[in-house]
Amino acid sequence: MDFDTLVIGAGAAGMMCAAHTGGRVLIVDHAKAPGEKIRISGGGRCNFTNMHCDPAAFISENPHFAKSALARYTQWDFIDLVDRHAIPWHEKTLGQLFCDTSAKDIIAMLRGLMQSAGAELLLSTEVSALKQTAGGFSFELNGTRRLTARRVVIATGGKSIPKMGATGYAYDVAPQFGHRVTPTEPALVPFTFPDRRFADISGVACPARITANGTSFDEAMLFTHRGLSGPAILQVSSYWAAGDPITVHLAPDTELGTVL
């Protein structure tokens, strides 16, 4: 075997895996640089974790997965890792943690961890073929180089932000090896309307309580030329399905009597 582990995708999950899995590791990505979504996250400062990270905050068909995953590696473990690498950070609203300077600090930290572990990183590289063999997997890089690995980790992420190179690679490859892929729906997205009913107040933000299917979020809401956005809308979009009503309360903490 050429490698013990092949990791496909050099995002946050892929780099953490390559840094900690041990043995001979090859990590590949079709992008020109690793961690591209990290680089743009949090407005360029990377909202790398949350003080209040809890299994109940995750949406999953299998709630126990979030419990077991977070029990094995908590937000405090990652905060400790960031502190050990002397990356300054600060807390914003609702326990959100951001780098003081740049998301590039997190990328550099993860690259350093991979290098220390001896993982080999190949960029601008596509896995053009992947097959299971008796002893592991054989794969082809950029249609020419053929190698083998005992294990394969698919860490290419979802289809979000296609302009940055995101594809449905994982959804196409995983079923080849017997995995069931759950159909996906857009999440953490704004609500848009066919008309431009809020165009005159586009750019106006206000606190609001947004409710869908019994789940509410009290955060900022933003009127846009196409509809509604902002933290509250993005959060509740994960709980909404087509045809469901949405309740927007613009004065959730105000007694009606005091206004009248």
Which stretches of residues belong to each language-model region?
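N-terminal Rossmann-like FAD-binding beta1-loop-alpha1 element of flavoenzymes
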Residues: 3-27
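Short hydrophobic core segments
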Residues: 6-8, 28, 127, 146-163, ...
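Glycine-rich active-site loop/strand segments that organize a redox cofactor
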Residues: 43-93
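Glycine-rich loop(s) and the adjacent beta-strand/alpha-helix scaffold that form part
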Residues: 151-197
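An anion/pyrophosphate-binding glycine-rich loop and adjacent beta-alpha core
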Residues: 32-34, 39-40, 48-55, 88, ...
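Feature captures the FAD/FMN-dependent oxidoreductase FAD-binding
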Residues: 72-151
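General beta-strand structural signal in soluble alpha/beta enzymes
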Residues: 27-29, 91, 121-123, 154, ...
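Residues at the starts of beta-strands that form the adenosine-phosphate
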Residues: 4, 24, 120, 180, ...
